Amino acid sequence: PTERISASLDTNSVYTMLAPNCLHVRRNAGSVTSSIGASNTGFSPKSMFLIFIALILSRKGSEILLYPEKTLPLHRNITITEMSYTIKDFEIMAPVGSRESLAAALHAGADSIYFGIESLNMRARSASTFTIDDLREIAKICDEHGVKSYLTINTIIYDEDIALMRKIVDAAKEAGISAVIAADVAVMAYCNEVGQEVHLSTQLNISNAEALKFYSRFADVVVLARELNLKQVRKIYDAIQEQQIKGPMGELVRIEMFCHGALCMAVSGKCYLSLNELNASANRGACMQVCRRAYTVKDKESDIELEVDNQYIMSPKDLKTIHFMDEMIEAGVRVFKIEGRARGPEYVRTVVECYKEAIQSYIDGTFSDEKVANWDERLKTVFNRGFWNGYYLGQRLGEWSKNYGSEATERKVYAGRGIKYFSNIGVAEFLIEASEIKVGDKLLITGPTTGAMYVTLDEARVELKTVDVVKKGVHVSFKVPDRIRPSDRLYRMVPAEELKAKRKE
């Protein structure tokens, strides 16, 4: 009954029979699924295999005339039905470490956002702009946009933290936060006690179906361990379906995985390098990124320096999965989490937009190499340390970055601040305070409400006259695609190579 017979007949279709109980056909990278269960039809495994062959040759709406064994009726008609995904079946979760990033996530079409407050989250040092007093406003803004809000309480919790943890959970519940992301059983248990939905962090390192089944008593969504490959993820997904593993809300547990962003050298966490070197615990949200530095390796006995191919021997490249999003979906991933709460709003907007487009293309059946190439180029423009596939496709060893900091192909250079928006003509006025701008420049506008807005400067006006170059100290007006606010920040986007060349001069 558990034997799996699979045949890959072409590059666009995968046909699988789970003999003798169930049969699945997936076409066009998973956008279509046909299923027949033997228990519902009464056919033997042999007959089910004939159905399997017939399905291969069939199209939606067609009927198969079957002639099973003599012990069964002479024939049966089975209509082929197809199941297609909708955008609501998936969730793009955006990282939010500032009000600018929150606005950028909402404008980019994120389905959910995650953020931290106070000291009990894994970005307490690098992205701690929110406090407990902000919870109600964040929940309200997200609700108005139809976006779910998730609060991270995912550090190691000590006895002295229990009172603060409960205070934060109570405040989240009262504010209407959608869920708490937790890694400690104390947090999970208290969330369940007060009726606050909880999701499980990758810090738990859940890597098998039995562990997921155990934790399902607490949570409806589980982030699996980052070191799993997609075959392992699929086995866990199949177990959820077959065993009907449900969370406290009564729904099948959903699988969440990181799809983009920085990877820790310790994979799913529990790193003590920063604590050992600088007394700053990564597991308490205070990682000092010691692993990102360049190192030389010496033999302690002889003091001979060993030759290594890369000085950044503990700094992984960033994860990027957009080119195999179809495989992620086929493995059962339903919530796609983007790392980057310490990143700027332009990063959040660009990454969310690309992955949202990728999922929509998968659903539409228009996912293509050309689109992937376009997304890749756009993703390269924002913060990254170079990209690799992570461990999802079976790679056993990591890939290491070649530089300290970002390898983004574009860098932002501060130019000025917003003064006024003329809504009747869609024009914004800015005061140029630093770097000059010129016609043809790619500009970035950021702000707590504006988020991140890109615009190409096609025409610039100074005192109503068109100009090609706008110098420091000058008020300039130009068309923008949306409203800007006073004190929004204006940047000029510069190719990274151009900026490096100027610094060498």
Q: What annotation goes with each model-predicted range?
A:
Residues 130-134:
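Glycine/small-residue-rich interface belts in oligomeric ring/scaffold proteins
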Residues 2, 6-13, 29-47, 58-62:
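Intrinsically disordered, low-complexity segments enriched in small polar residues
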Residues 83-108, 112-124, 136-139, 143-155, ...:
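Surface-exposed amphipathic alpha-helical tracts and adjacent flexible/coil segments at the periphery
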Residues 125-129:
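Conserved non-cysteine loop/helix-boundary elements of the Radical SAM core domain that shape
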Residues 22-23, 44, 50, 57, ...:
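Short hydrophobic targeting helices and cationic amphipathic motifs
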Residues 16, 47, 55, 77-82:
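Residue-level detector of intrinsically disordered terminal segments
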